[in-house]
């Protein structure tokens, strides 16, 4: 049985994925887990770049969702991405962070996409 946090995370991933699909991206993989880290979404952008997406979803604005993606999290994402890329042909890549804050009254998502982050989103 899923927890409320898991439902919130899955909802945020759905919202983020739709944002990429609206921009003509293609979903390659989702919720990929390795011992070194996990990847929420992997998409191919309209320009052919493979994008590894970390999604952070919160209710209200008391906590900055993107701040949860720090250097350590980025390192784990890079390691997981390297494993996912093994054996695949060379392709340009980037790492994005999508911060989603749900309005506590309406539940409406506010989406911020940080593209090509290097050391986390701030």
UniProtKB/Swiss-Prot annotation:
HAMAP family: UPF0102. SUPFAM superfamilies: Restriction endonuclease-like. It comes from the Bacteria. This is UPF0102 protein Cgl2031/cg2228. Belongs to the UPF0102 family. It comes from Corynebacterium glutamicum (strain ATCC 13032 / DSM 20300 / JCM 1318 / BCRC 11384 / CCUG 27702 / LMG 3730 / NBRC 12168 / NCIMB 10025 / NRRL B-2784 / 534). One of its GO terms (molecular function) is nucleic acid binding. Pfam families: UPF0102 (PF02021). PANTHER family: UPF0102 PROTEIN YRAN (PTHR34039:SF1).
């Amino acid at each position: 049985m899923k927890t409320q946090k898991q439902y919130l995370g899955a909802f945020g991933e759905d919202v983020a994925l739709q944002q990429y699909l609206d921009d003509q991206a293609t979903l390659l993989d989702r919720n990929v887990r390795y011992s070194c880290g996990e990847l929420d979404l992997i998409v191919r952008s309209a320009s052919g770049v493979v994008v590894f997406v970390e999604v952070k979803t919160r209710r209200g604005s008391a906590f900055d969702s993107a701040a949860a993606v720090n250097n350590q999290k980025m390192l784990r994402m890079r390691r997981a991405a390297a494993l996912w890329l093994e054996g695949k042909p060379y392709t340009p890549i980037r790492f994005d962070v999508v911060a989603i804050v749900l309005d506590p009254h309406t539940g409406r998502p506010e989406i911020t996409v940080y593209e090509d982050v290097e050391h986390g989103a701030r």
